[in-house]
Every structure is written in structure tokens, then in C-alpha cells.
């Protein structure tokens, strides 16, 4: 039997207020005057969170419309715009929900891979690592911040760019960022996590390593959705 040697996120910081460390986290990843590009969920336009983003030099904030799942055309347009404006960038930082996470991962990959993102929809088709990328989720439960795929709607199909180059280099998990999320959105993405737990415990390809994650995640989901009759800060911590 052959076992898969799978890629995971390189660095993780977790805790309330962790977002405040973003500047020091990004500092060693900056390359000369090449900017950091912050892809931010359009929900946050005009909101206080934007003023906390640690901009330096040519850094740029781009508000991404993620009403619908990212499209390959959207990814290609953003990557081409950045190449034309800056040549290259120090990194792509995604701030938002699952669709924003996927968009940031895809744009990072397309900064260093030729053609269209549609060419890489599938399994292990990406040839080169992308530029540095960090994910900062503002919703819990999608799992997009830790997955090896980025789900895109292409010209002919909806499919992920699945590769070992896809996972983020860094994620910042700050439960405080989920506090102002709409209640229904919190519930939907939380149940997404709950269903992932069931899949990870009842699926076809199981092992004790993966089951240990599924069991603990299910326990935390049950604390949030079953044993409590109200939502509090601890719920945000547990779900993230």
C-alpha cells in the first residue's frame, strides 16, 4: 500500500487579537518594494477592519465581490492587472470568507503560472508555486483556509485547482474577526464544518490520524450547536 505525503499550511497563529500581529508576520516576506496585495471581502468596504490592515509602501487593498463563488475569469483578470501594475508582488493576503480564501490562493498561483486558471482546474496540474499567500478567515467552518484546493467556476465546469502548491503559507485565525458576521452566515458555514466532520468520520478512506481531527472537530461543533442555547465568544473560539 502506498500512502500519500500530503501538504499542510506552513504556519498558523490562533487567538483573539492575532490580527494585530499581521504586520510583523508579513515583514520578513516582503521583497524590496514589491507590494503586498490584500484581497478583502467587499462586505468589509467602509468597515473598521480595513483601517487595521498594515499597509506599507505600494501595498494595495482590493475589495473582491464574492457574492458568488470565484470564476476563472475573475482570477485571470486580477492576476493580469497585478502583473501589469507591479510586475510581481510580495504576496497575496486574503481576508474574508471561504470564497475570498479561494480567490487569494488562485490569484497567488496565477502570478507564477502561465495561461488561464481554467487550465489548472483538476488534480496536480499546477506547475509552479505561487507568490507568498496568507489567509485570514472572517467566517468559521468553510475549511478553505487549510485546504489544498481552490474551487473555481470555469468556462465549462466548476472544479478546484488541487495541488500541493495551493495551500496557504500562513493563516491567521482570530475569532474576534467573526463577531460581526451575519447570524445566518455563521450558522451556514458552521453547519458546513459539522457536515465535513461527519464525512471525515464516515467516509471511505479513513485512518486514525484523520479521525482524530474529525472527532475533536465534531465535539466542538456539538458544543456550539447542541449543548448551548446562545451564541457567545467561546462559540466563536470553538468553531474557528
Q: Which role fits each region the language model picked out?
A:
Residues 11, 35-37, 61, 90-93, ...:
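Structural motif
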Residues 23, 76-79, 105-108, 191-199, ...:
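Predominant activation on well-ordered alpha-helical scaffold segments within soluble catalytic domains
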Residues 88-105, 138-144:
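Glycine/serine-rich anion-binding loops at beta->alpha junctions
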Residues 102-114:
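DPxDG-like acidic metal-binding loop motif
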